[in-house]
Regions:
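Terminal targeting segments of Actinobacterial cell-envelope proteins
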Residues: 1-17, 27
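Hydrophobic membrane-insertion alpha-helices, especially the h-region
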Residues: 22-34
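Surface-exposed loop/turn elements that mediate protein-protein interactions on large endomembrane-trafficking
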Residues: 50-75, 92-115, 134-165, 185-215, ...
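Blade-terminus and WD-like Trp-Asp/Gly-His loop motifs, strongest in beta-propeller folds
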Residues: 75-85, 119-129, 168-178, 217-226, ...
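Extracytoplasmic intrinsically disordered, low-complexity "stalk/linker" and propeptide segments
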Residues: 85-87, 101
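Residue-level marker for isolated small/hydroxyl-bearing positions within beta-strands
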Residues: 90, 131, 180, 228-229, ...
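Loop/turn-rich, solvent-exposed surfaces of beta-rich toroidal or solenoidal domains
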Residues: 297-329, 346-355, 365
Length: 403
């Protein structure tokens, strides 16, 4: 995660790493590969130490149909708090802007030319990488188009900084970004990309490297680059840690759901009871967190300080329309305990996406109900959500939600 969240539309599903790999061919032909943490239902674009940690509450169990799920079409009701006045979100589009949900006010983001095809956002430490979408046609459906300009928008910035040209962009390990280029017309499923690490000011942070053919950078870590196959084959979907200077291949991970510069979280294949595995790359310490029975992890995102992992839990049910109850929960990396985010027990068709807000410790989610679209914000330890309602025609169509 990720995320550009637009009002309306069909929900995409599936864990984080496969979203990247599966979308690569389309993203390259459109120009840049977008890094999503976690996944939103719309693919046009993608905190600090918490003041307190709520005591773990009871975990809701799976229901038949939508029993126990937030009432629709009214959305989240009951006791809520006003949206924090200083909490703003970027909005994508032909002219990206800052959006203040508390008041509905918008402010322009300087330094960006108008782009009819819109912009894509990639979350990085301290801000976002931005790149124009493109409708350029290439020789084949999965071939790379011409590289395009990458910009950096700081969390507190009012304008962008130009970084360089690339086909793909991914966050680095220490406040940097990785820019990857392919020859125009090359097929990234078989070609090797050339990547260079740059600072948020656009200065080179090292020599360029040639990636293994058929692999793409998901993010930089303290132990090398986390790579994903551009076109994974059934039964071989695995990410790998890769150090260009190391003679031996790095470790592989199947079912990655989230990654930061210092941690990787994944869910091994499971049947009755799933467990999230977390590897601390700095210490080598593994951690196992059990999930509630009859649940699976749909998406996840680490907080900026790495102390919390937000997860979207999906619960089994017998709903005729395929929608399932979901709930947002936080995993404390210090204790391994789960804490339910209050008032987020909703239908999977309602939860558009979620992520950590920039420059703060709040978890933000967008929820689309029949008659309204709501933004929810929650600081760990708070007893209730802060809610803002998005008004059609008065709110941006595509919001970038956190990490």
């Amino acid at each position: 995660m990720p995320d550009i969240l637009s009002q309306g539309g069909d929900r995409e599903s599936g864990p984080w790493p496969r979203r990247i790999a599966v979308a690569v061919a389309l993203a390259l032909v459109a120009a840049a590969i977008v890094y999503y943490l976690p996944r939103s239902r719309h693919g046009t674009a993608q905190p600090a130490q918490p003041t307190a940690t709520a005591a773990p509450g009871p975990v809701q169990q799976g229901f038949s149909g939508d029993q126990g799920v937030a009432a629709e079409p009214d959305g989240i009701t009951g006791q809520t708090s006003p949206w924090p006045g200083g909490l703003r979100l970027p909005a994508a589009g032909q002219r990206p802007m800052w959006f203040y949900p508390a008041t509905g006010r918008t402010a322009p983001i300087g330094g960006l030319p108008r782009q009819p095809s819109g912009y894509q956002f990639t979350r990085a430490a301290g801000g976002w990488a931005m790149q124009a979408s493109s409708d350029a046609r290439t020789a084949c459906a999965s071939c790379a188009g011409p590289p395009r300009t990458v910009y950096f928008l700081a969390d507190s910035g009012q304008s962008v900084t130009r970084l360089g040209l690339a086909n793909a962009v991914a966050p680095g390990a220490a406040g940097t970004l990785w820019l990857t280029r392919y020859p125009t017309g090359a097929d990234p499923r078989t070609a090797a990309g050339v990547a260079r690490e740059v600072s948020s000011a656009g200065r080179p942070a090292g020599s360029q490297i040639t990636l293994p053919a058929g692999y793409l950078i998901e993010r930089g870590t303290s132990r090398g680059l986390l790579l994903a196959p551009v076109a994974p084959e059934a039964g071989t979907i695995a990410d790998r840690l890769w150090d260009p200077a190391a003679p031996q291949p790095g470790r592989t991970f199947t079912g990655v759901i989230a990654a930061s510069a210092t941690q990787i979280a994944w869910v091994p294949p499971c049947s009755t009871r799933c467990r999230v595995q977390v590897l601390n790359l700095a210490t080598g310490r593994p951690q196992t967190v059990g999930m509630p029975a009859a649940s699976s992890v749909a998406n996840a995102a680490f907080s900026a300080d790495g102390g919390l992992l937000a997860v979207e839990l999906s619960f089994s049910n017998n709903s005729a329309d395929g929608a399932q109850p979901v709930e947002l929960e936080l995993v404390s990396m210090a204790t391994g305990r789960l804490t339910a985010v209050p008032q987020t027990w909703v239908s999977s068709s309602a939860l558009v996406g979620f992520g950590w807000a920039a420059g703060g410790d709040s978890l933000v989610a967008e929820l689309a109900f029949t008659t309204k679209v709501q933004l929810a914000s929650w600081r760990p330890g708070a007893s209730r959500l802060a809610i803002a309602v998005l008004r059609p025609g008065h709110s941006p169509d595509s919001l970038v939600i956190g990490q």
